[in-house]
Amino acid sequence: MSQQLIGSEYTVYRSGDGNGGFTPTTVKVPTLGPHDILVCITHSGVCHTDITFCQMGAPIALGHEGVGIVEAVGSLVTQFNVGDRAGGGFHRDACGHCKYCLSGRDIYCYNRVIFGEGDFDNGTFGKYYIGKETYLHKIPEGLASEHAAPLQCAGATVYAALKATVTPEKRVGILGIGGLGHLAIQYANKMGADVVIYSTSTSKEAEARQLGAKEFHLLDNMFDDVKAPIDVLVICGTKYPDWDRVMTKEFLARVGVIVPLAAPVHGPLSLPAGAMFFQGYHVFSSLVGSRNVHDEMLEFSARHGIKPMVQIFKHDGAKTIREVFELVKMNKMRYRAVLEMGD
């Protein structure tokens, strides 16, 4: 690592200003550990989770969907070279030897470090991000950095859930076409499933079909024209449906799976117990993807031409981040915001 980089200052944007916002904070590039990598961020996705942590008031360096160029590597790094593209920012470390790590589920390691649970001085809204070699991911050729950035959280979240629940013969219902939903359409379609969309607006129908949807229904009449039961229902919107009507064998096939990805996380998930028991329904939760699934997601995306629809904002400091946050909170983003760093 160049000695000129050690101690050089840059700005991170730290939540916890006491008013639901964030504060620009100056930090210094540390001496890298043997397995650390210094990434000069070129693009960072903006996720609603960043806004949530601002509202919670915890002092966390914001940003967890970063892509950039490797600028320096620790002495024992073997998987990356200076000049490589790397992505990451949500899942940052794990013990490597527990039953979760050894079975490819390191995201659930009891000693994990993820965005918001540790490493509070390190975020992807700043110029630099310091990542562990094993928790950064090479960006495949053919996947532009502005498209790869949102995949570091949103893409991994959706892909991991669908990989665990979807097979080619399934009918997959996706409720909500937003930052997660428009990716879910693409992944489920390329996995061979028949994709059924439930949305609040007919204005999104043409777009949904272009992304790979076979059927489109408005939420208000989602139970009125059921051609066949769906096998998997992925919740990508901010509100739950009427569970009493969802959990019938006419709408959700027996042994069907409910996947809540973007539902209200602070409220209860109340489901009719009788339907759960007698129809064999399951609930499957997903928190991004472990390392192997994350890498697979990036390769799958590049191979099948899957990319998020993004709005790019030239990163001009705190004012740009505040502008993007407001657009996200007003549900005016279509569909993922990306900060593009300056020189």
Predicted regions mapped to residue ranges:
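C-terminal hydrophobic helical "lid"/dimerization subdomain
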Residues: M1-L5, R291-D343
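Glycine-rich beta-strand-centered segment in the early N-terminal region that forms part
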Residues: K28-S44, F53-K99, P140-L143
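NAD(P)H dinucleotide-binding glycine-rich loop of Rossmann-like/cofactor-binding domains
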Residues: A94-L175
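Glycine-rich cofactor phosphate-binding loops and adjacent beta1-alpha1 units
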Residues: A164-R171, D194-V196, E205-F284, R322, ...
